[in-house]
Amino acid sequence: NHHVGADSLQKLGSEAHNYYRDGFYAASQDAELKCPDVELNVLISIDDVTDRVQAVITPGTKPEEAFAARRRVMAEIEQESLAATGLRSDVITLYQGGRYHLYRSKKYTDVRLVFAPEQQIAFFGGDADNFEFPRYALDACFFRAYENDKPARVPHHLAWSETRVAAGDLVFVSGHPGHTDRAATVRELESKRDRTIPFALAMLNRLEVLYGAYGAEGPEEKRQALGDLFGAQNGRKSREGVLAGLLDPAVFARKRQTEARLRDLLARDAGDKPSPFERIERAEDEIARVSLRHNLLEGAVGFNSQYFANARTILRAAQEATKPTGDRLREYRDSNRASLEQQLFSTKPIYDAFEIVKLADSLTFLATALGPDDPTVKQVLAGKSPRERAAELIRGTRLGTRAPDAAAAPVTDLRRPLYDGGMAAVAASNDPLILLAQAIDEEARSLRKTVETAGEIKRQAHAEIAQAVFASAGEDRYPDATFTLRLAYGTVLGYDQDGRMIEPITTYAGLFARAAAKHDTPPFDLPPRWQRLRQALEHDQPFLETPFNFVSTADIIGGNSGSPVVNPRGELVGLIFDGNIQSLVLDLAYDDTKARAVSVDAAGILAALRQVYKAEALVAELRGPAAAAAAAAADWRPLFDGRSLAGWKPTPFGGEGEVRIVAGAIEIAQGSDMSGITWGGEFPRQHYEISLDARRVDGSDFFCGLTFPVGDDPCSLIVGGWGGGVVGLSSIDGLDAANNDTTHYHAFTTGEWYAVRVRVTPERIECFINDERVVDQPLAGHALSIRDEVIPSKPLGIATYATTAQLKNIRWRPVAPPTSAAESAP
């Protein structure tokens, strides 16, 4: 997504090149921009290591000892895997401790920017439309992964679909949902409702105001702050949605009912020992006792600066390096070193003025939350105001890549020598932020230990609950989200909102209508490039009708951004970028009544690349060699010149109506009963598409009965039959269009033109009305035929039944066969 790639756009950009605002396109690989500190991971394997992890915990082990033992064995597993495979290795906790799995991933760290749209079209509608639908956002970027300075060659990839999604389609989503609390206890949800979310909202509301005010100082300040502002707004709105669910009495009523059943199940074997639920409640009490200070000090909410983050990383890397890898804080294990170093040594420019504003505000938050007389606050502020102290710290540090400043002398970056020098270099350092990180480190570590120990108590309790559930109901219930790969499925489906039906698919026509309705005022204004092309685009009917965004019932949550949406053939049809406001309750429980995942449509992405950004090379690459070959051969070939019946002749049905040319169209007058035209020239039998526009002028039955060859067999597409509304193929396995699986009903308006298109390959027949797929009929195992009265239309003909119809734009084009068996596989 653009909003995921935004961090890279900000890091690559400058005052002169604002890629976040203005977009970017590399017309060749040489022009691609290398992104600082980006790491892409591709999952290779998953191994169950539950028995090995749980074996180190024996009955009676104290929680802090159990936590240390578990940390050691997980580090051992990760280190052994890294040494054996060279792959990134992470032990993941599932079911809150019921299962442990080892995930191995191939890592790419040379990642380059290929394309990004302007921020205004990627986030059209801004915060007002965020978590809403209908949406009109081109929230997509393209990056290329490299190995050994060459584009990575991968054995598997998703093909870009040539078919658009339609209402009712089945879709699948593979992605990394971040966190859910569906297995949380009532007490844990109460803590989230009463403590965790209110604290986060207080912080995010404050940051939203801060970043907005800083960005209002000028265009460069706006560029620096825009990504952080979006993050604050998005975080605020998402938590408000979760909080609304937690404040719903019905949600807690259902949760209490579920928990009561689990308590009864566990009580049978509990004896006199505290139940898992009671142990979780005590652990929550302990976390609540230290929560505020933990968030401010260990969570660094009170120290909002990239320079401070670098200082803490350098300090703790030196401290932890003196310990065996299994005894270290998790982020400093040997198996995580490469990722840590990539982040620490980012070349992203840091803007001192912005850092001072952020740090001053967070120090103010620290002082007001703990009180000005708190010993830690006094030590941190060192007798100065938050603003003065922030300026002193930022101007005195040398722990980052400073953005160029003509008024300031160059400053040597000390991150690498301090990191490589270990404890001796850190102990000798007088960098003010190293000294600050040292000053709060003992208390911060103590707070972390308290929370981790309580977390271990909860983990063991949840493991008992999970084992009880496994024993009684099996492992059919999937675990809460953990930022690891999950597969979800759903249907492209609208929903009712306040008595109004929300259709599941938006188009580019809707984008322009939305902008016009809002008088093109921010955040509903279009970027300059789109404004320049607007008049032409608004007269391009195929572009206007192209799907832009769509919703589905797929089970997603924060973290799914950028997840591919695929059809049953494994082809990419969209990209998840949001959920509607009703989807935020999915943190607590899945419900498909109104909750929807929001995607940008793959067809909409291609249309923008082709017609707005003129990125033909990228389009050809995305569609793949087979599709590119098809596109190269996709010049439509006319079957009607608009002036004569050349190549066509009236079909001798008997009782047929007159055929004539009227205003550039073929008019087939109503007969008794069938009338039509038959093609007398050459026509392919496979690998082709045929397209035409048809309309009913008078009558009440089918106005387009298109008979076409499928290899050696004929078939007919009936449009508007059996009283005027049936669409389908005649015949499949001896059953006509009204009685087989292709039967589809459509409300056709007399006098209105409809675009009819049929694609024939050896594998299937696909039929489209106004570019909406209405038939997708596989051929394997099925017999094709036509009704006896239609035989005069063979091999290619168009007929009507008791209806006057007009036809125009009759044409065909070849469809290139797959270039290999692998490419033809579904």
Named regions from a protein language model:
Residues A630-P826:
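Carbohydrate-interacting regions of secretory-pathway proteins
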Residues N1-A630:
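Terminal presequence/propeptide segments associated with secretion/organelle targeting
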